[in-house]
From Swiss-Prot:
Function: Probable non-functional remnant of adrenomedullin-5.
Signal peptide: 1-18
Protein name in UniProt: Putative adrenomedullin-5-like protein
Entry's family note: Belongs to the adrenomedullin family.
Any one GO cellular component localisation term in the record: extracellular region
Amino acid sequence: MTIHILILLLLLAFSAQGDLDTAARRGQHQVPQHRGHVCYLGVCRTHRLAEIIYWIRCLHQGALGEGQPRAPGPLQLWAPPVARGGSPARFPGFRPAARGLAQCPARWVTSGTARPLLGFSLPICMLELLLHISSPLTPAPETVFPSPSPGCD
């Protein structure tokens, strides 16, 4: 749970910085922001905040196995059989949702197969979203929205 909160705070810190203007985005509809930042509708981190929060919520629900029957005892982290080295033949595309919970991707990978992220296991869509968030040390990517992988909403 603490890891999820830290990831959320990290993403919120990145969203508070605003989006840097790049040559690839010039000429699109712009909305002026404070401190001289220019926001292109739908692509700046502030406008993507709802999407980021959605994926973090999916990450949290998937990690706790919400909507699944649970044995008594402490909460266990959940991952599909493929992520645990099991057979992919029985692997469903989505986990069943209970009482209005969001349908979240159930495909998990370890960060070593995508991008080093302190050894966390994250949904593939979350990893793709994190790859497109720039920091002051890395240039903003040319493509702002990640292309959804199969099984992502």
